[in-house]
């Protein structure tokens, strides 16, 4: 009777090890779920960024105000008879 119990205990330990630590076990599934959640958040950030960039592109295509704002802020252009003061901190 004792050898059968020892074999069953060894088999139980082996199965538990495979369940928890082997490839496809609970630990690896947990790590995969964390990676999936991280990737979902990263994808959402990129979607938001793309949406903002598409809105900027649309403004530049159809709005003169956006073009003027871009020229003033990014390129440092000014209108005729206008004085530009740049304050350096």
From Swiss-Prot:
Segments crossing the lipid bilayer: 4-21
GO process terms (BP): FtsZ-dependent cytokinesis
Coiled-coil blocks: 29-62
Parts of the chain on the Cytoplasmic side: 1-3
Periplasmic topological intervals: 22-89
Sorted UniProt keywords: Cell cycle, Cell division, Cell inner membrane, Cell membrane, Coiled coil, Membrane, Transmembrane, Transmembrane helix
Membership in a protein family: Belongs to the FtsB family.
Function of the molecule: Essential cell division protein. May link together the upstream cell division proteins, which are predominantly cytoplasmic, with the downstream cell division proteins, which are predominantly periplasmic.
Subunit note: Part of a complex composed of FtsB, FtsL and FtsQ.
PANTHER family cross-referenced by the UniProt entry: CELL DIVISION PROTEIN FTSB
NCBIfam families reported in the protein's UniProt record: PRK00888.1
Name of the protein in question: Cell division protein FtsB
Gene assigned in the entry: ftsB
